[in-house]
Each structure stands twice: as structure tokens, then as C-alpha cells.
């Protein structure tokens, strides 16, 4: 490890959004490709919404995806603690320092006063910003407000007419004027909790973070943070703002686009290596433009300069295609193990012994290469787990085609007489019955397929029939025969 340090700093207030996971991934890839230290920090100052359950979920999702951190709440390092709720004294110390150096002050404005200021600014056609009313309060004025029971916030003084410039590692030079930042900003709330922009600067500085890699929705936080860095005499890190992920309609990815949390994809049976691969390609591509890559290959090829500034689109079809490639390369045992919870939830299976497990392997292997995600197995293989199959109008038409009844009755009769149904037996049987009935090809196979499966396409009949078993096959043939007019 060298002196480079990056961090991922999520808030444990809910499930992790795809965009946040992509941010974690870029920090991780930077750390592993550059030999940097990767820090996990939990920003839990929102006491009402933060929970231990969501913190545990953060750990779980990162570990599932294969993102390991070097320092964090569960991996002590030299710059802990790594939860903001355990660092409150540190923030108060630096807030007091800013007050003593006349770079911050206590503000006693009421919400009503602030709302009135905002309303007047809007009426004038101005951008609402804090008026600075409390910037120069006398000691007597402060004491009077305290006697009234007002609880102050602490505001950091935003300099007038200053231009803040920084070189973004992705977007290039960014220039923002201080008079667009909303006036003197709150750094400590009336309940004593630090605001995001204040706490993040203190933490990044004291944890010696050299590169801040985050989403572009933080761009307008950066000049505020740079001013705090300067006021406290801290070294300013390098900044990189990754473009936000968009939905197919090129608006910010949200719930209306479908699943937006990483856990939803894990639960559906997307493979972690596929998600790792897919997310790494949202705004980045290797020089050779290869798409399917292992984690190790991605780390080896990763170059931060190849992250582009255009907003990537979350293409679910591309993800499904990529996940399908990984499912195809996975062992049948792995896919069966992932499928079992889905089959249990569907009520298809209960206890599993070796015989059932081996049967599941045979069933799932019929569909494995066509699965885009593992949860699809409950629908694709449904016919193996239900007693009866349903017939659509289209499949009923097939059952009522010429010669269907003859074919189904002769197949039923022969299977009823069979002692054991194996693939070899079914293969020979179907060949023999085509000769006997003089019905061949689709005209012979389609009624059987529809009768037994309820579908007009799917895996080979010679594989389906032995796996369904004699009783199910006979019962379904009987039902189909009774439907024929």
C-alpha cells in the first residue's frame, strides 16, 4: 500500500441504491489498481433514519459483490472510529475552532424568520440565500436569544465574491462562484449534530483521504467543502465526480425504472461477478473493449482516466445478457443451490434429500443456459412442480388438431404398461409409435408436448417425460384427451 487513500461513506438509512454501489466499486477499483487503502466509513448522523440493520445490510451487499475494505467499523485502523455517530466530539472541537477564529458563528434565526427571508427573495426574483442576519451579533444579543429559549445552529461564513476552482479528475476544471452557494451555511444543527458538508471534510481530512470519488450530484457540495478545508488549514484532496446512472428514458435512475437497489438483484438470483462486471462498465471501459471480464481482469485493466463524463444508461437487457453468460459458465450445483430458496418460496419443494437434490439438478439443467437470472426458474420449470398444467386457447387448438387423440391415447396406453421410464425408453417409444400411428414430426410431437407440459415449446420430450414421472404424465394425458372435442 502507498499513501493514496479513498473511501466509501454510505448512510445506513435504507437499502443501497445501484448508483451508490457503483461509487463504492469505482473507489474499490481505484484502490486495488493503484495500491491505495480503501476505507469504509458509516455516515450515521441522521439518528432518526439510521439503523444497525441497514449498516449490516451495507456490509452484506459489499461483501456479496466482492468489494473488500481495508479499514472500517469492523476493521480498526489508525484513523477511527469509522462511524460518524462516534466522532461527535471531534466535530464540535473543529466547529469551536472556527467560531474562535471568526470563521463561523452561532445563528439564532427561527424557521419562521428564515422562511420569510426566502419568500422575500423569491418575490424580488433573487436566489434564496441566508441573509447573514446573525453574523455580527453582540454578546448581549446572543444572551437575549438564549433567554428566549432559542437553540442556535452554527454557520460557516461563506466569503463574498470568491471564485472556487478545482480540477475534477473526470470532468476537468470546474469553477463556481461563492455567491451561488446559498450564503453562510449551517455546519452544526441545533441538536448538536454536524451537517454532511462539515462532517465529511473533518473525516476525510483526519482519515487522510487523498482522492474523493463520488457521484456528480455532489459537485455543488465540493466548493463548500473546499472552503472548509481552507478555513481549517487542511490539505485539499483530489475530487472525481462520476456521472449519474440514467434509466432507459435518460432520466435519473429511480424506482419507476424498476429495481434500483443492489439487494433486489441479489434476491432475484443475479450473480455477484456478473453485477461486478456490469456495474464496472457503467462509465468505464477497458482499452481492448472486452465486455465479459473477471474481477481480477477488471482490476488489472482498470485505469481511472478511462472513466468518461457522459451519463451511462442502466440497460437491464444488457445486464440480463451478461448475467446469462455467467450462469452458463457456473456449475449446476451452484445454480441449484441458488434456485432452492426460490422454489421453496413458491411452495414447490420442502425437505431435500440426495434423491430430490439430484432430481432438481436434472430439472434445472434443462433450463440453466436460458436463465437470465435464477428466480426465473420458478416460472420456467413450473410444470415439474404442479400437479396439473393449464392450457391456453392456442394450446387447446393444438390438442384439437387432426390425429391428436389417436397419438395421445396410444402414448398413454404404452406408458401405463411401462415398468420404468428412462430417456432411452422414451426415445425408442416415440420412434416406434410414429411408425405405428403413421403420424410424424410436429403432428405427432406437438400434441404430446402440449398435453404433458401445457406449452408448445421447451426442453426435449425424452428428458421431460422421465423427470415428470409416470403418474403425472398419465394424468396429464388423460386430462388432455378429455379436452379434445
From Swiss-Prot:
Top-level enzyme category: ligase
Residues at which ATP binds: 255
Keyword tags: Aminoacyl-tRNA synthetase, ATP-binding, Cytoplasm, Ligase, Nucleotide-binding, Protein biosynthesis
Keyword Zinc appears in the UniProt entry: no
Locus of motif 'KMSKS' region: 252-256
Biological process terms in GO annotation: glutamyl-tRNA aminoacylation
Pfam family, one: Anticodon_2
InterPro entries found in the cross-reference section: aa-tRNA-synth_I_cd-bd (IPR045462), aa-tRNA-synth_I_codon-bd_sub2 (IPR020751), aa-tRNA-synth_I_CS (IPR001412), aa_tRNA-synth_I_cd-bd_sf (IPR008925), Glu-tRNA-ligase_bac/mito (IPR004527), Glu/Gln-tRNA-synth (IPR000924), Glu/Gln-tRNA-synth_Ib_cat-dom (IPR020058), GluQ/Sye (IPR049940)
GO cellular component, one term: cytosol
GO molecular function, one term: ATP binding
This enzyme's EC code(s): 6.1.1.17
Motif ('HIGH' region): 10-20
Reaction(s) catalysed by this chain's protein: tRNA(Glu) + L-glutamate + ATP = L-glutamyl-tRNA(Glu) + AMP + diphosphate
Record's subcellular location: Cytoplasm
Keyword ATP-binding: yes
Gene3D superfamilies named in the record: 1.10.10.350, HUPs
Protein purpose: Catalyzes the attachment of glutamate to tRNA(Glu) in a two-step reaction: glutamate is first activated by ATP to form Glu-AMP and then transferred to the acceptor end of tRNA(Glu).
Family named by the database record: Belongs to the class-I aminoacyl-tRNA synthetase family. Glutamate--tRNA ligase type 1 subfamily.
NCBIfam families in alphabetical order: gltX_bact
Quaternary structure annotation from Swiss-Prot or TrEMBL: Monomer.
Full protein name: Glutamate--tRNA ligase 1
Organism encoding this protein: Thermoanaerobacter pseudethanolicus (strain ATCC 33223 / 39E) (Clostridium thermohydrosulfuricum)
Amino acid at each position: 500500500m502507498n499513501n493514496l487513500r479513498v473511501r466509501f461513506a454510505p448512510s445506513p438509512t435504507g437499502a443501497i441504491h445501484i448508483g451508490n454501489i457503483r461509487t463504492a466499486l469505482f473507489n474499490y477499483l481505484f484502490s486495488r489498481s493503484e495500491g491505495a487503502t480503501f476505507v469504509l466509513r458509516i455516515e450515521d448522523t441522521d439518528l432518526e433514519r439510521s439503523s444497525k440493520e441497514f449498516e449490516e445490510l451495507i456490509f452484506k451487499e459489499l461483501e456479496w459483490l466482492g468489494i473488500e475494505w481495508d479499514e472500517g467499523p469492523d476493521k480498526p485502523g489508525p484513523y477511527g472510529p469509522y462511524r460518524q455517530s462516534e466522532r461527535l466530539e471531534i466535530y464540535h472541537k473543529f466547529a469551536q475552532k472556527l467560531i474562535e477564529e471568526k470563521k463561523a458563528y452561532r445563528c439564532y434565526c427561527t424557521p419562521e424568520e428564515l422562511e420569510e427571508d426566502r419568500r422575500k427573495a423569491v418575490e424580488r426574483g433573487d436566489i434564496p440565500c441566508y441573509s447573514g442576519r446573525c453574523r455580527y451579533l453582540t454578546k448581549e444579543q446572543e444572551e437575549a436569544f438564549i433567554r428566549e429559549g432559542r437553540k442556535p445552529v452554527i454557520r460557516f461564513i461563506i466569503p463574498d465574491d470568491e471564485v472556487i476552482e478545482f480540477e475534477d479528475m473526470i470532468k476537468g476544471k470546474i469553477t463556481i462562484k461563492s455567491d451561488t452557494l446559498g450564503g453562510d451555511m449551517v455546519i452544526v444543527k441545533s441538536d448538536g449534530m454536524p451537517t454532511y458538508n462539515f462532517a465529511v471534510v473533518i473525516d476525510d481530512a483526519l482519515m487522510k483521504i487523498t482522492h474523493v470519488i463520488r457521484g456528480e450530484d455532489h459537485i455543488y457540495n465540493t466548493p463548500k467543502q473546499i472552503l472548509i478545508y481552507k478555513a481549517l488549514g487542511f490539505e485539499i484532496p483530489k475530487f472525481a465526480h462520476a456521472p449519474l446512472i440514467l434509466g432507459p428514458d435518460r432520466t435519473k435512475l429511480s424506482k419507476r425504472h424498476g429495481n434500483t437497489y443492489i439487494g433486489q438483484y441479489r434476491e432475484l438470483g443475479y450473480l455477484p461477478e456478473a453485477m461486478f462486471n456490469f456495474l464496472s462498465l457503467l462509465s468505464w471501459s477497458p482499452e481492448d473493449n472486452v465486455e465479459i471480464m473477471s474481477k481480477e481482469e477488471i482490476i488489472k485493466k482498470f485505469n481511472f482516466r478511462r472513466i468518461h463524463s457522459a451519463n451511462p444508461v442502466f440497460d437491464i437487457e444488457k445486464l440480463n445478457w451478461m448475467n446469462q453468460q455467467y450462469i452458463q459458465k457456473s456449475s449446476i450445483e451452484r445454480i441449484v443451490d441458488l434456485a432452492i430458496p426460490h422454489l421453496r418460496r413458491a411452495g414447490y419443494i420442502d425437505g431435500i434429500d440426495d434423491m430430490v437434490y439430484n432430481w432438481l439438478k436434472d430439472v434445472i439443467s434443462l433450463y440453466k443456459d436460458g436463465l437470465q437470472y435464477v428466480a426465473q426458474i420458478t416460472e420456467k420449470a413450473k410444470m415439474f412442480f404442479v400437479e396439473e398444467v393449464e392450457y391456453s386457447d392456442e394450446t387447446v387448438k393444438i390438442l384439437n388438431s387432426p390425429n391428436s387423440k389417436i397419438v395421445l391415447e396410444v402414448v398413454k396406453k404404452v406408458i401405463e404398461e411401462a415398468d420404468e421410464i428412462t430417456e432411452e425408453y422414451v426415445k425408442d417409444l416415440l420412434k416406434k409409435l410414429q411408425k405405428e400411428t403413421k403420424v410424424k414430426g410436429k403432428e405427432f410431437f406437438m400434441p404430446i408436448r402440449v398435453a404433458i407440459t401445457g406449452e408448445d415449446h421447451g426442453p426435449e420430450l425424452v428428458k421431460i417425460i422421465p423427470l415428470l414421472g409416470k403418474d403425472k404424465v398419465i394424468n396429464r394425458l388423460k386430462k388432455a384427451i378429455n379436452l379434445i372435442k
